[in-house]
Amino acid sequence: MAQHLRKPDWLKIRLGGNEQFTKTKSIVESHCLHTICTSGKCPNMGECWSRGTATFMIGGEICTRSCRFCNTLTGKPLPLDPKEPANVAESIRLMNLKHAVITSVDRDDLPDLGASHWVNTIRTIKEVNPQTTVEVLIPDFQGRLDLVDQVVDAAPEIISHNMETVRRISPQVRSAAKYDVSLSVLRRIAERGVVAKTGIMVGLGETEDEVLELMDDVLQAGVSVLTIGQYLQPSRKNIPVSEYVTPERFEYYRQQAVNKGFKKVESAPLVRSSYHAEKHI
């Protein structure tokens, strides 16, 4: 059965522990911040934190959705922390980041679904760190393109929204999110002239043809940056891994994506949407 699949050697994870890792951890904790690195049990946390990079998660740590692949806490979120934008901006300054990546939980409980908090965070980061480029990984805002426009108007350099998986499997693993709604979000980002980026997981039972079809869909929507990584089951409550995709097939996907016309492609077992994000500017 899928949940008993043995993890292959190519998925060995590097643990952190150097001085820079400790400094990153200290900055994050002292400013009472959340990161997707910890909440999502990211396999690259050791490497990234040891390089002094982290992906900040705003809007609190409790998500209003319960996607079957995700390890983030779900339930009724706390009110937004008005100090969070300033704390994120100051942490970026202390870490001396040239490129900052921000994501968020879904806040379907808020009238504007968290869009104004996104805007405040991006603008505060840019005020405090004028030389830092900003990449944001946004939710679908329930398909409300007026809210997507608000984020675009805050002028981040890259806006990412993850498709997560192929069309057929999407309803099984994404809570409330819809494949075509995500495409509409990405299309709006690209239409506004911002670099549009998306990421998917493989190993959920998709076929090669379905992955190639997704590439065509997002390319047609205007996406220029694509990341592909192995789905890893973060806990027993999450959907089990269907398959551990070989490095050779990841390379095949990378070549196919490049041939189709994507400008930047990351495709390897441990790739996540914010992995080596500074290269995507």
Curated annotation (Swiss-Prot):
PROSITE patterns: RADICAL_SAM. [4Fe-4S] cluster 1 binds at residues 37, 42, 48, 274. CDD domains: Radical_SAM. It is found in: Cytoplasm. Keywords: 4Fe-4S, Cytoplasm, Iron, Iron-sulfur, Metal-binding, S-adenosyl-L-methionine, Transferase. One of its GO terms (molecular function) is 4 iron, 4 sulfur cluster binding. GO terms for cellular component: cytoplasm. It is an enzyme of class 2 (transferase). Its EC number is 2.8.1.8. Binds 2 [4Fe-4S] clusters per subunit. One cluster is coordinated with 3 cysteines and an exchangeable S-adenosyl-L-methionine. This is Lipoyl synthase. It comes from Parabacteroides distasonis (strain ATCC 8503 / DSM 20701 / CIP 104284 / JCM 5825 / NCTC 11152).
